[in-house]
Amino acid sequence: MAAAAMHTSAEFINLKPNMWKKNPVRASGSCCLGSSSGDEISRKRKLPILLFDVMDTIVRDPFYQDVPAFFGMPMKQLLECKHPMVWIEFEKGLIDEEELARNFFIDGRDFDLEGLKECMRSGYSYLDGMQELLQTLAADDFEIHAFTNYPIWYNIIEDKLKLSAYLSWTFCSCIAGKRKPDPEFYLEVVGHLGVEPCDCIFIDDRPTNVKCAIEIGMGGLCFENADSLAKDLSDLGINVSVPKL
């Protein structure tokens, strides 16, 4: 629940390394020369691996409309009253939800934590076309992981929307203790996967997060909507044919 950021930038939209333009998706192998014993493992995996941000990329984020309404105040007032760091600490798993409730507001006022969680749950929904796009990618045996800044409440999203039917909740900030765009978080991701950065494509609605992915060598796509993402993936050799995106 950080303050709203600029989500569009001509400088960062649809950034990707030139190699993805030149080389189609490979069913196996590693894109980087000189790999060691990891090659045998890589050859058994379908590449590239797809890393998806979740909020406002796959799932609607309730914070910008539903949460101000829940507290009965406009967004500007909410941002002025809210502690500037407590949600970030919650996303990094440094505090639990009880401490979030105690420190959410600068003045320490009480609020209905369970009501807020229900507000969030009610507001979670798939963005138009994204469930179908994920279903198509999963059916084509792509390896898909969530790579998200979100607290333990990702369990609420999973309970409602069942994203695990299409991806693994592998890289969550609340577990890693790090948030995008910290480069160390990205390096942990590729280290855990046992691949080179260039074997991954990262999709996120925030240009700063995409920029960091590209700087460490990943392919990067700045998400706008499901229709444009399907086109961008097709440009990279990943053909996504989803009706009525």
From Swiss-Prot:
One GO cellular component term: chloroplast
Pfam families associated with the record: Hydrolase
Keyword tRNA-binding: no
Cofactor(s) needed: Mg(2+)
S-S pairs: none
InterPro entries (alphabetical): HAD-like_sf, HAD-SF_hydro_IA, HAD_sf
Temperature section of the record: Optimum temperature is 40 degrees Celsius for both catalytic activities.
Phenotype upon gene inactivation: No visible phenotype and no effect on flavin metabolite profile and abundances.
Transit sequence range: 1-26
Enzyme class: hydrolase
EC number in record: 3.1.3.102, 3.1.3.104
Keywords assigned: Chloroplast, Hydrolase, Plastid, Riboflavin biosynthesis, Transit peptide
Catalysed reactions, as listed in the record: FMN + H2O = riboflavin + phosphate; 5-amino-6-(5-phospho-D-ribitylamino)uracil + H2O = 5-amino-6-(D-ribitylamino)uracil + phosphate
pH dependency: Optimum pH is 6.5-7.0 for both catalytic activities.
NCBIfam families: HAD-SF-IA-v3
Quaternary structure, from the entry: Homodimer.
Its biological purpose: FMN hydrolase that catalyzes the dephosphorylation of flavin mononucleotide (FMN) to riboflavin. Can also dephosphorylate 5-amino-6-(5-phospho-D-ribitylamino)uracil, also known as ARPP. Not required for riboflavin biosynthesis in planta, but may help maintaining flavin homeostasis within chloroplasts.
PANTHER family: ALPHA-D-GLUCOSE 1-PHOSPHATE PHOSPHATASE, FLAVIN MONONUCLEOTIDE HYDROLASE 1, CHLOROPLATIC
Name of the protein: Flavin mononucleotide hydrolase 1, chloroplatic
Organism lineage string: Eukaryota, Viridiplantae, Streptophyta, Embryophyta, Tracheophyta
